[in-house]
């Protein structure tokens, strides 16, 4: 079976067990290909994380492909139909950890760039790659550190295409032109431990906090807007008690998350939470962690270039969306760059038997190449 350039490179990347934060030579494989077509290669290692900044050209505007070589753990190996790091093609589908999220997109980016440079050796501006091995993990020493380095030397990205798996039913049907913000909190409510038979001598933090938690769950934080759904509040963990049936717990710990729109700020959400907790007279402390600001790329050069390319290659009228979790786009957008996410179908990401349709890989490459044509030819 003759494999296309994109499929061959995908297979090579998928053989690397690059579980966060281990890159396992994926970036070297990509860098070697890019160096051959004139990219300046700059590895950036921070802590235990490998990052790659590769650039062809010295002038603006700068078009940047962004993505990650790391993958999530496999889960139970005996639940997979084949070795997750020995990629297999079965019934037209390519199986392997990272096949959808997002090594096939990385391969498509490299091949698209090779083809574009061959046709346009003196293209306008610059093409760049920003690749990390820590997107699925803490994301502390990855993209954010590369962006900080670029900012210090005033190296600006004009347009950024992140290869996250954005498609839902068919290739290119959804492009992410923004993401909601993500605000996490750990709430600790203090009570007084005691015997369940003597509740008057204790204070049950579960009982005291329950009305406040119910109110938080029922609160309408905003109604969203044309780009973003309404802000969502979700409790992810609750813990209290010693495990004994006859002890009133002395404290309650609750972890919750906001996925929020541009209609509110993180500070406004914090203030409203404190108002509700204070109204219920709780003795509490709360630790906040803002893991991502919301961002939005309005219709403009990058959106138009992507929509035109998708329509030309697949015949699909693409839809703009801001749904889903956070991505590394949240670190790139604050620099002023236009950011889009466009990749393969996301139906099996992080799952056992993760896979992607082989017949989507060459069209994705064509889309990426045509976006380059639309912006830099």
Swiss-Prot record:
Keyword S-adenosyl-L-methionine carried by entry: no
Binding site for Zn(2+) 1: 68, 101, 164
EC number: 3.5.1.18
InterPro entries for this protein: Bact_exopeptidase_dim_dom, DapE_proteobac, Peptidase_M20, Peptidase_M20_dimer, Peptidase_M20A
Cofactor(s) needed: Zn(2+); Co(2+)
GO terms, biological process: diaminopimelate biosynthetic process; L-arginine biosynthetic process; lysine biosynthetic process via diaminopimelate
Single annotated GO MF: cobalt ion binding
Residues annotated for Zn(2+) 2 binding in this entry: 101, 136, 350
Keyword Hydrolase carried by entry: yes
Active site (catalytic residues): 70, 135 (proton acceptor)
Family membership noted in the UniProt record: Belongs to the peptidase M20A family. DapE subfamily.
PANTHER family tied to this protein: ACETYLORNITHINE DEACETYLASE (PTHR43808), N-ACETYL-L-CITRULLINE DEACETYLASE (PTHR43808:SF31)
NCBIfam families: dapE_proteo (TIGR01246), PRK13009.1 (NF009557)
Function summary: Catalyzes the hydrolysis of N-succinyl-L,L-diaminopimelic acid (SDAP), forming succinate and LL-2,6-diaminopimelate (DAP), an intermediate involved in the bacterial biosynthesis of lysine and meso-diaminopimelic acid, an essential component of bacterial cell walls.
Assembly description: Homodimer.
Protein's name in the database: Succinyl-diaminopimelate desuccinylase
Species for this entry: Acinetobacter baumannii (strain AB307-0294)
């Amino acid at each position: 079976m003759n494999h296309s350039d994109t499929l061959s490179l995908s297979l090579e990347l998928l053989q690397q067990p690059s579980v966060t934060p281990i890159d396992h030579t994926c970036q070297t494989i990509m860098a070697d290909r890019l160096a051959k077509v004139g990219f300046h290669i700059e590895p950036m290692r921070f802590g235990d994380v490998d990052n790659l900044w590769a650039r062809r050209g010295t002038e603006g505007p700068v078009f940047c492909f962004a993505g990650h070589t790391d993958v999530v753990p496999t889960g139970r190996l005996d639940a997979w139909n084949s070795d997750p790091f020995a990629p297999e093609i079965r019934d037209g589908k390519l199986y392997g950890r990272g096949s959808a999220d997002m090594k096939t997109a990385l391969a498509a980016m490299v091949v698209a760039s090779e083809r574009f440079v061959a046709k346009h050796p003196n293209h306008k501006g610059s093409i760049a790659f920003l690749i990390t091995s820590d997107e699925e993990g803490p994301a502390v020493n990855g993209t954010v550190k590369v962006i900080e380095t670029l900012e210090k030397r005033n190296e600006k990205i004009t347009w950024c295409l992140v290869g996250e798996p954005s498609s839902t039913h068919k290739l290119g049907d959804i492009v992410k032109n923004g993401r909601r913000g993500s605000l996490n909190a750990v709430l600790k409510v203090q009570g007084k431990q005691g015997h369940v038979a003597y509740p008057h001598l204790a204070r049950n933090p579960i009982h005291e906090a329950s009305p406040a938690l119910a109110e938080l769950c029922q609160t309408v934080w905003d109604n969203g807007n044309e780009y973003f759904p309404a802000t969502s509040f979700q409790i992810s963990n609750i813990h209290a008690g010693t495990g004994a049936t006859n002890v009133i717990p002395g404290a309650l710990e609750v972890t919750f998350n906001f996925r929020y729109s541009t209609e509110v700020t993180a500070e406004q959400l914090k203030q409203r939470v404190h108002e509700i907790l204070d109204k219920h007279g709780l003795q509490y402390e709360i630790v906040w962690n803002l893991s991502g600001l919301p961002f939005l790329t309005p219709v403009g050069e990058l959106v138009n270039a992507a929509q035109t390319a998708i329509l030309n290659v697949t015949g699909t009228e693409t839809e703009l969306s801001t749904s889903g979790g956070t991505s590394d786009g949240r670190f790139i957008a604050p620099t002023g760059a236009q950011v889009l996410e466009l990749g393969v179908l996301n139906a099996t990401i992080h799952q056992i038997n993760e896979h992607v349709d082989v017949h989507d890989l060459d069209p994705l490459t064509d889309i990426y190449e045509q976006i380059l044509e639309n912006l830099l030819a």
